């Protein structure tokens, strides 16, 4: 069950592991990247939502991108989230990322001011024109306040050859299904990845290409097992892996912010990281961490 899509399988939006002073902990982050590779993850996204893109400056991101590309060394694909409300910052990080040798960029729709479809179209087209790299759209209306409709996605794909995919983080699989139906008319190889962890199977049934989701930080092996079982037609194993993922979804309910929950779970799995996230986001409490440990202990 393969396709000609450029991005297919299981992709991890990596946490950005930090020291207590807010600087990046490259030692533990490198170990985390190695773990993803050893598990068989198809690619990693730097500076997505879980990677706290909104709170880190372009210079720090560029340095981190160079580190990650060197660390990964071609063992999996490297994607970079270039999202920002300032288009100049988007273009600057896109240029730095392209120079570093990443495989693709991911651009979230402009947030805060709720752009019209025409504004969003101009924005994404400007991002695509600023790079020769493949660009993946990022639709997360719960956080951005605006939705990339199936029709808009199809228009962008048809008019910009290097817009080659979308991460559709919408808790309604019918939206993703409609995106697939619309965009495949203009680009049969367009990649459609779901942002919700438990949607891998229904995404694939609907004609999509997999997931780019947070729990891959915690148990990448489980997601890889699901993907490989699906590809080979081993549906008994696929169901078992999907059931585990369904159970792990309760981790998201343990903390005030999903980023804290994921960092806490990575720590509980054995990587001795600091679970700090950038203020003003709420930090993980001791009680929340104990709840995470309890969930993962079962």
Indicate residue ranges for each PLM-predicted region.
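A general structural signal for stabilizing positions within well-ordered secondary structure
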Residues: 1, 35, 96-97, 157, ...
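Active-site beta->alpha loop and helix N-cap motifs at the rims of alpha/beta catalytic domains
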Residues: 3-12, 17-147
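C-terminal alpha-helical cap/extension of soluble enzyme domains
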Residues: 6, 11-16, 35, 39-41, ...
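A general structural signal for well-ordered alpha-helical segments in protein cores
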Residues: 29, 61, 65, 90, ...
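Generic non-transmembrane alpha-helical segments
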Residues: 67, 71, 130, 182, ...
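Short helix-capping segments at alpha-helix termini
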Residues: 70-76, 100-101, 131-133, 158-162, ...
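Catalytic alpha/beta core domains of metabolic enzymes, predominantly
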Residues: 143-246, 252
